[in-house]
Amino acid sequence: MTEPGASPEDPWVKASPVGAHAGEGRAGRARARRGAGRRGASLLSPKSPTLSVPRGCREDSSHPACAKVEYAYSDNSLDPGLFVESTRKGSVVSRANSIGSTSASSVPNTDDEDSDYHQEAYKESYKDRRRRAHTQAEQKRRDAIKRGYDDLQTIVPTCQQQDFSIGSQKLSKAIVLQKTIDYIQFLHKEKKKQEEEVSTLRKDVTALKIMKVNYEQIVKAHQDNPHEGEDQVSDQVKFNVFQGIMDSLFQSFNASISVASFQELSACVFSWIEEHCKPQTLREIVIGVLHQLKNQLY
Protein backbone atom coordinates (compact mmCIF):
# COMPACT_ATOMS: atom_id res chain seq x y z
CA MET A 1 0.00 0.00 0.00
CA THR A 2 1.31 3.37 -0.94
CA GLU A 3 1.21 6.34 1.32
CA PRO A 4 -1.51 8.92 0.73
CA GLY A 5 -0.38 11.54 -1.66
CA ALA A 6 2.39 9.39 -3.16
CA SER A 7 2.26 9.07 -6.91
CA PRO A 8 3.18 5.93 -8.86
CA GLU A 9 5.97 7.94 -10.43
CA ASP A 10 7.64 8.48 -7.02
CA PRO A 11 11.18 7.04 -7.12
CA TRP A 12 10.83 5.67 -3.61
CA VAL A 13 7.75 3.77 -4.68
CA LYS A 14 9.56 2.35 -7.68
CA ALA A 15 12.65 1.47 -5.67
CA SER A 16 10.71 -0.25 -2.89
CA PRO A 17 9.83 -3.90 -3.48
CA VAL A 18 6.48 -3.28 -1.89
CA GLY A 19 5.82 -0.40 -4.23
CA ALA A 20 6.95 -2.43 -7.22
CA HIS A 21 4.36 -5.14 -6.46
CA ALA A 22 1.66 -2.70 -5.50
CA GLY A 23 -0.38 -3.70 -8.52
CA GLU A 24 -0.24 -7.45 -7.84
CA GLY A 25 -2.60 -7.34 -4.91
CA ARG A 26 -2.28 -8.71 -1.43
CA ALA A 27 -0.37 -11.83 -2.44
CA GLY A 28 2.21 -9.88 -4.35
CA ARG A 29 2.75 -7.53 -1.45
CA ALA A 30 3.23 -10.48 0.92
CA ARG A 31 5.81 -12.04 -1.36
CA ALA A 32 7.59 -8.72 -1.57
CA ARG A 33 7.69 -8.42 2.23
CA ARG A 34 9.05 -11.94 2.61
CA GLY A 35 11.71 -11.23 0.00
CA ALA A 36 12.67 -7.98 1.71
CA GLY A 37 12.90 -9.75 5.07
CA ARG A 38 15.18 -12.39 3.62
CA ARG A 39 17.38 -9.75 2.00
CA GLY A 40 17.55 -7.77 5.25
CA ALA A 41 18.57 -10.86 7.14
CA SER A 42 21.24 -11.59 4.57
CA LEU A 43 22.56 -8.05 4.87
CA LEU A 44 22.64 -8.17 8.67
CA SER A 45 24.20 -11.64 8.82
CA PRO A 46 28.03 -11.74 9.10
CA LYS A 47 28.31 -13.88 6.00
CA SER A 48 25.80 -13.70 3.18
CA PRO A 49 24.67 -17.00 1.74
CA THR A 50 25.88 -17.97 -1.72
CA LEU A 51 23.23 -17.84 -4.39
CA SER A 52 23.11 -20.75 -6.76
CA VAL A 53 22.54 -19.79 -10.37
CA PRO A 54 20.62 -22.35 -12.39
CA ARG A 55 22.34 -23.76 -15.39
CA GLY A 56 19.66 -22.55 -17.71
CA CYS A 57 20.30 -18.91 -16.74
CA ARG A 58 23.56 -18.93 -18.56
CA GLU A 59 21.79 -19.44 -21.85
CA ASP A 60 18.28 -18.12 -21.33
CA SER A 61 17.88 -15.03 -19.20
CA SER A 62 14.10 -15.22 -19.45
CA HIS A 63 13.96 -18.08 -17.01
CA PRO A 64 12.05 -17.15 -13.78
CA ALA A 65 14.97 -18.14 -11.61
CA CYS A 66 17.27 -15.87 -13.61
CA ALA A 67 14.88 -13.03 -13.04
CA LYS A 68 15.04 -13.66 -9.30
CA VAL A 69 18.85 -13.72 -9.39
CA GLU A 70 19.01 -10.50 -11.35
CA TYR A 71 16.59 -8.91 -8.94
CA ALA A 72 18.63 -10.08 -5.96
CA TYR A 73 21.85 -8.58 -7.40
CA SER A 74 20.26 -5.42 -8.77
CA ASP A 75 20.47 -2.00 -7.13
CA ASN A 76 16.70 -2.00 -6.66
CA SER A 77 17.01 -4.79 -4.10
CA LEU A 78 18.12 -2.29 -1.42
CA ASP A 79 15.35 -1.12 0.88
CA PRO A 80 15.22 2.71 1.07
CA GLY A 81 13.83 2.50 4.59
CA LEU A 82 16.79 0.48 5.77
CA PHE A 83 19.14 2.85 4.00
CA VAL A 84 17.55 5.91 5.62
CA GLU A 85 17.53 4.23 9.03
CA SER A 86 21.18 3.12 8.77
CA THR A 87 22.16 6.57 7.59
CA ARG A 88 20.32 8.15 10.52
CA LYS A 89 21.98 5.76 12.98
CA GLY A 90 25.42 6.42 11.50
CA SER A 91 24.94 10.16 11.73
CA VAL A 92 23.77 9.84 15.32
CA VAL A 93 26.78 7.67 16.22
CA SER A 94 29.21 10.00 14.46
CA ARG A 95 27.58 13.01 16.14
CA ALA A 96 27.83 11.29 19.52
CA ASN A 97 31.50 10.47 18.88
CA SER A 98 32.21 14.05 17.87
CA ILE A 99 30.39 15.40 20.94
CA GLY A 100 32.29 12.98 23.17
CA SER A 101 35.63 13.97 21.68
CA THR A 102 34.76 17.66 21.93
CA SER A 103 33.61 17.30 25.50
CA ALA A 104 36.71 15.29 26.34
CA SER A 105 38.95 17.91 24.79
CA SER A 106 37.11 20.75 26.54
CA VAL A 107 37.30 19.21 30.00
CA PRO A 108 38.82 21.84 32.33
CA ASN A 109 42.01 21.18 34.30
CA THR A 110 41.65 19.40 37.57
CA ASP A 111 42.72 20.77 40.94
CA ASP A 112 45.94 18.70 40.88
CA GLU A 113 46.97 20.18 37.53
CA ASP A 114 46.19 23.69 38.76
CA SER A 115 48.19 23.12 41.95
CA ASP A 116 51.13 21.74 39.94
CA TYR A 117 51.01 24.78 37.66
CA HIS A 118 50.92 27.18 40.61
CA GLN A 119 53.79 25.33 42.31
CA GLU A 120 55.93 25.53 39.17
CA ALA A 121 55.13 29.23 38.81
CA TYR A 122 56.01 29.80 42.48
CA LYS A 123 59.30 27.91 42.06
CA GLU A 124 60.19 29.99 39.02
CA SER A 125 59.36 33.23 40.80
CA TYR A 126 61.33 32.13 43.89
CA LYS A 127 64.38 31.36 41.73
CA ASP A 128 64.07 34.74 40.02
CA ARG A 129 63.87 36.52 43.38
CA ARG A 130 66.92 34.67 44.69
CA ARG A 131 68.84 35.44 41.50
CA ARG A 132 67.97 39.14 41.73
CA ALA A 133 68.89 39.25 45.44
CA HIS A 134 72.23 37.54 44.75
CA THR A 135 72.96 39.96 41.91
CA GLN A 136 72.17 42.97 44.08
CA ALA A 137 74.34 41.68 46.95
CA GLU A 138 77.25 41.04 44.57
CA GLN A 139 76.91 44.53 43.12
CA LYS A 140 76.91 46.08 46.61
CA ARG A 141 80.02 44.09 47.55
CA ARG A 142 81.87 45.26 44.44
CA ASP A 143 80.82 48.85 45.03
CA ALA A 144 82.09 48.67 48.63
CA ILE A 145 85.46 47.28 47.48
CA LYS A 146 85.76 50.01 44.85
CA ARG A 147 84.99 52.72 47.42
CA GLY A 148 87.58 51.20 49.77
CA TYR A 149 90.31 51.35 47.12
CA ASP A 150 89.33 54.91 46.25
CA ASP A 151 89.59 55.91 49.93
CA LEU A 152 93.02 54.26 50.20
CA GLN A 153 94.27 56.21 47.19
CA THR A 154 92.97 59.39 48.81
CA ILE A 155 94.43 58.73 52.29
CA VAL A 156 97.81 57.16 51.48
CA PRO A 157 100.24 59.89 50.36
CA THR A 158 102.40 57.52 48.30
CA CYS A 159 99.37 56.60 46.16
CA GLN A 160 98.84 60.26 45.31
CA GLN A 161 102.41 60.78 44.13
CA GLN A 162 102.96 60.32 40.41
CA ASP A 163 105.14 57.35 39.55
CA PHE A 164 107.11 57.95 36.35
CA SER A 165 107.41 54.21 35.66
CA ILE A 166 103.62 53.88 35.57
CA GLY A 167 102.90 57.20 33.90
CA SER A 168 99.38 58.54 33.80
CA GLN A 169 97.81 55.08 34.01
CA LYS A 170 95.42 54.26 36.82
CA LEU A 171 97.00 52.44 39.76
CA SER A 172 96.08 48.78 39.96
CA LYS A 173 94.67 47.24 43.10
CA ALA A 174 97.89 45.32 43.79
CA ILE A 175 99.97 48.53 43.66
CA VAL A 176 97.50 50.34 45.92
CA LEU A 177 97.66 47.53 48.49
CA GLN A 178 101.49 47.39 48.38
CA LYS A 179 101.82 51.14 48.83
CA THR A 180 99.33 51.01 51.69
CA ILE A 181 101.30 48.24 53.43
CA ASP A 182 104.56 50.18 53.05
CA TYR A 183 102.96 53.32 54.43
CA ILE A 184 101.52 51.42 57.43
CA GLN A 185 104.97 49.95 58.21
CA PHE A 186 106.48 53.43 58.00
CA LEU A 187 103.84 54.73 60.40
CA HIS A 188 104.60 51.91 62.87
CA LYS A 189 108.32 52.81 62.84
CA GLU A 190 107.54 56.48 63.31
CA LYS A 191 105.19 55.67 66.16
CA LYS A 192 107.87 53.59 67.92
CA LYS A 193 110.43 56.34 67.48
CA GLN A 194 108.06 58.95 68.82
CA GLU A 195 107.20 56.77 71.81
CA GLU A 196 110.93 56.52 72.66
CA GLU A 197 111.30 60.28 72.32
CA VAL A 198 108.29 60.83 74.55
CA SER A 199 109.77 58.49 77.19
CA THR A 200 113.09 60.39 77.11
CA LEU A 201 111.33 63.71 77.42
CA ARG A 202 109.30 62.47 80.36
CA LYS A 203 112.52 61.46 82.14
CA ASP A 204 114.00 64.88 81.46
CA VAL A 205 110.88 66.52 82.79
CA THR A 206 111.07 64.44 85.95
CA ALA A 207 114.75 65.38 86.48
CA LEU A 208 114.00 69.06 85.89
CA LYS A 209 111.18 68.93 88.40
CA ILE A 210 113.55 67.46 90.99
CA MET A 211 116.15 70.15 90.28
CA LYS A 212 113.46 72.81 90.51
CA VAL A 213 112.40 71.57 93.92
CA ASN A 214 116.03 71.56 95.13
CA TYR A 215 116.66 75.09 93.88
CA GLU A 216 113.50 76.30 95.51
CA GLN A 217 114.64 74.83 98.81
CA ILE A 218 118.05 76.51 98.46
CA VAL A 219 116.44 79.85 97.70
CA LYS A 220 114.09 79.50 100.63
CA ALA A 221 116.96 78.62 103.00
CA HIS A 222 118.97 81.63 101.80
CA GLN A 223 115.96 83.90 102.33
CA ASP A 224 115.49 82.61 105.86
CA ASN A 225 119.21 83.25 106.75
CA PRO A 226 120.33 86.21 104.64
CA HIS A 227 123.66 86.66 106.52
CA GLU A 228 124.73 83.02 106.21
CA GLY A 229 127.37 82.49 103.59
CA GLU A 230 128.62 86.03 103.52
CA ASP A 231 132.15 84.82 104.35
CA GLN A 232 133.62 83.36 101.16
CA VAL A 233 135.48 80.02 101.19
CA SER A 234 138.98 80.10 99.77
CA ASP A 235 140.13 77.87 96.94
CA GLN A 236 142.52 76.08 99.26
CA VAL A 237 139.70 74.99 101.50
CA LYS A 238 137.73 73.75 98.47
CA PHE A 239 140.77 71.79 97.29
CA ASN A 240 141.27 70.26 100.72
CA VAL A 241 137.63 69.08 100.74
CA PHE A 242 137.99 67.55 97.30
CA GLN A 243 141.31 65.93 98.23
CA GLY A 244 139.88 64.34 101.38
CA ILE A 245 136.93 62.86 99.42
CA MET A 246 139.15 61.47 96.67
CA ASP A 247 141.62 59.97 99.16
CA SER A 248 138.82 58.06 100.87
CA LEU A 249 137.45 56.79 97.55
CA PHE A 250 140.89 55.86 96.25
CA GLN A 251 141.58 53.70 99.26
CA SER A 252 138.50 51.56 98.65
CA PHE A 253 139.12 51.62 94.88
CA ASN A 254 142.74 50.42 95.23
CA ALA A 255 141.64 47.59 97.51
CA SER A 256 138.94 46.32 95.10
CA ILE A 257 140.54 46.66 91.66
CA SER A 258 142.47 43.91 89.83
CA VAL A 259 144.43 44.79 86.67
CA ALA A 260 145.24 41.26 85.46
CA SER A 261 143.11 41.74 82.34
CA PHE A 262 140.79 44.28 80.85
CA GLN A 263 137.77 42.11 81.55
CA GLU A 264 138.69 41.78 85.24
CA LEU A 265 139.36 45.53 85.48
CA SER A 266 135.96 46.32 83.98
CA ALA A 267 134.21 43.88 86.27
CA CYS A 268 136.02 45.25 89.34
CA VAL A 269 135.21 48.88 88.43
CA PHE A 270 131.49 48.12 88.06
CA SER A 271 131.36 46.21 91.32
CA TRP A 272 133.28 49.02 93.16
CA ILE A 273 130.90 51.69 91.82
CA GLU A 274 127.87 49.68 92.90
CA GLU A 275 129.27 49.11 96.37
CA HIS A 276 131.24 52.29 97.34
CA CYS A 277 129.58 55.00 95.25
CA LYS A 278 126.17 54.76 96.72
CA PRO A 279 124.57 58.06 97.74
CA GLN A 280 124.54 57.12 101.39
CA THR A 281 128.24 56.10 101.31
CA LEU A 282 129.28 59.30 99.51
CA ARG A 283 127.29 61.37 101.99
CA GLU A 284 129.08 59.77 104.93
CA ILE A 285 132.49 60.37 103.28
CA VAL A 286 131.73 64.06 102.59
CA ILE A 287 130.48 64.67 106.14
CA GLY A 288 133.60 63.04 107.61
CA VAL A 289 135.95 65.16 105.45
CA LEU A 290 134.12 68.39 106.37
CA HIS A 291 134.40 67.58 110.07
CA GLN A 292 138.14 67.05 109.69
CA LEU A 293 138.63 70.37 107.91
CA LYS A 294 136.49 72.18 110.47
CA ASN A 295 138.68 70.91 113.27
CA GLN A 296 141.79 71.97 111.38
CA LEU A 297 140.51 75.49 110.62
CA TYR A 298 138.96 76.24 113.97
Curated annotation (Swiss-Prot):
Ranges of residues in domain bHLH: 129-187
Expressing tissues: Expressed in all tissues tested, including spleen, thymus, prostate, ovary, intestine, colon, peripheral blood leukocyte, heart, liver, skeletal muscle and kidney. Lower levels of expression in testis, brain, placenta and lung.
Span list, region Disordered: 1-63, 91-145
Bias (Basic and acidic residues): 116-127, 135-145
CDD domains: bHLHzip_Mlx (cd19687)
Residues with PTM Phosphoserine: S7, S45, S48, S74, S77, S98
Superkingdom per UniProt: Eukaryota
Biased composition (Polar residues): 94-109
Basic residues bias spans: 28-37
Any Pfam family: HLH
One Gene Ontology cellular component annotation held by this UniProt entry: cytosol
The keyword Chaperone appears for this protein: no
Molecular function (Gene Ontology), one example: DNA-binding transcription factor activity
Oligomeric form and interacting partners: Efficient DNA binding requires dimerization with another bHLH protein. Binds DNA as a heterodimer with MAD1, MAD4, MNT, WBSCR14 and MLXIP. Can also bind DNA as a homodimer.
PANTHER family hit by this protein: BASIC HELIX-LOOP-HELIX ZIP TRANSCRIPTION FACTOR, MAX-LIKE PROTEIN X
Listed name of the protein: Max-like protein X
Source organism of this protein record: Homo sapiens
